[in-house]
């Protein structure tokens, strides 16, 4: 073998192999769900979608996806939904903010502003 080919082979053997992403994959009628799984190699994102049927009733879905389209609200359907994506192992383990929590944010900011 030529020295250049030998050098290329040595360098390639030292490179780490691409690691598959680990995501929580589940569907749950309630606040949150956890089920860690190894995703296929082509997957680039962990996704969490929450569909709100009423302010207190929701469905949480978590999955592995090759592409992500984050949404805050789908105005065309009769149910509100939020979708978020992330790109590191088990990053979709935490839940998204619920509507009640989001409603408290302006009140908290106004209170803090009044204290300043």
UniProtKB/Swiss-Prot annotation:
InterPro entries: Ly-6/neurotoxin-like_GPI-ap (IPR051110), LY6_UPA_recep-like (IPR016054), Snake_toxin-like_sf (IPR045860), Toxin/TOLIP (IPR035076). Pfam families: Toxin_TOLIP (PF00087). Residues 1-20 form the signal peptide. Residues 92-116 form a propeptide. CDD domains: TFP_LU_ECD_LYNX1. GO terms for cellular component: dendrite; endoplasmic reticulum; plasma membrane; side of membrane; synapse. It is a lipid-anchor; GPI-anchor. It is found in: Cell membrane; Cell projection, Dendrite; Endoplasmic reticulum. It comes from the Eukaryota. Its main location: membrane. A lipid is attached at residue 91 (GPI-anchor amidated cysteine). Residues 21-107 form the UPAR/Ly6 domain. One of its GO terms (molecular function) is acetylcholine receptor inhibitor activity. One of its GO terms (biological process) is regulation of neurotransmitter receptor activity. Keywords: Cell membrane, Cell projection, Disulfide bond, Endoplasmic reticulum, Glycoprotein, GPI-anchor, Lipoprotein, Membrane, Signal. Disulfide bonds join 23-46, 26-33, 39-64, 68-85, 86-91. Isoform 1 is considered to be an endogenous 'prototoxin', that shares a N-terminal three-finger structure with snake alpha-neurotoxins. Acts in different tissues through interaction to nicotinic acetylcholine receptors (nAChRs). The proposed role as modulator of nAChR activity seems to be dependent on the nAChR subtype and stoichiometry, and to involve an effect on nAChR trafficking and its cell surface expression, and on single channel properties of the nAChR inserted in the plasma membrane. Modulates functional properties of nicotinic acetylcholine receptors (nAChRs) to prevent excessive excitation, and hence neurodegeneration. Interacts with nAChRs containing alpha-4:beta-2 (CHRNA4:CHRNB2) and alpha-7 (CHRNA7) subunits. Interacts with CHRNA4 probably in the endoplasmic reticulum prior to nAChR pentameric assembly. Interacts with KCNA2/Potassium voltage-gated channel subfamily A member 2. This is Ly-6/neurotoxin-like protein 1. It comes from Homo sapiens. The gene is LYNX1.
